[in-house]
Amino acid sequence: HRDLHSFPTRRSSDLSDPVLGPEMKSTGEVMGTGSSFGEAYIKSQHAADIKIPRTGTVFLSVRDPDKTEVFLNLARLLIKKDFKIIATEGTSDFLTRHNINSSYINKVHQGQPHIVDLIREGAIDLIINTTEGKQSIEESFSIRAEAVIRDVTYYTSLEASVATMDAFDYFSMVSVNRLQDYY
């Protein structure tokens, strides 16, 4: 089974920052069970009311330590699933060096048009944005806040993003079973 802590960002009237940190405490928990990690994970996402788009436009902006083969495989899988990739300069350059097509968009501090403009316009379906350091976290606050307002699914870790993409194959196979069926 897979436990998932659910944070009520969509129901909250304040715009507290949804970035996960050590001080954040769980306000709810769901559990997904399945015969595989992918099935359990997708069920936990559904139980937490997290909308996972199956196609559309994904915004990618990842910190340098996440620019790995794992990230490249994730980008390739997104393209295979018919996602269009929009990325910040450093991420877009990294993808281009590895023959993965993406469109470039400014960070907020680089001027308009920037990523928050695209989120407001409804042009972004999924966000994968990993940050490192106080400045980077602060600079991406407006992205996270707008994602919450517009109900755009947002991942702040490469691991959760990869788990979600790995679980794609289970969208159509989700079934409800008794716990006794698993144990």
Where are these regions (language model features)?
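Short, small-residue-biased leader/transition segments that mark boundaries at the very start
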Residues: 1, 5-12
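Long hydrophobic segments that form regular secondary structure
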Residues: 17-58
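A general structural motif
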Residues: 37-43, 62-66, 84-87, 106-116
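Glycine-rich phosphate/diphosphate-binding loops that line cofactor/substrate pockets in enzymes
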Residues: 46-58, 78-80, 118-124
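Short internal beta-strands
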Residues: 59, 82-94
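N-terminal active-site wall of soluble small-molecule enzyme domains
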Residues: 66-77, 91-94
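Peripheral docking tails and interdomain loops at the edges
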Residues: 106-107, 112-183
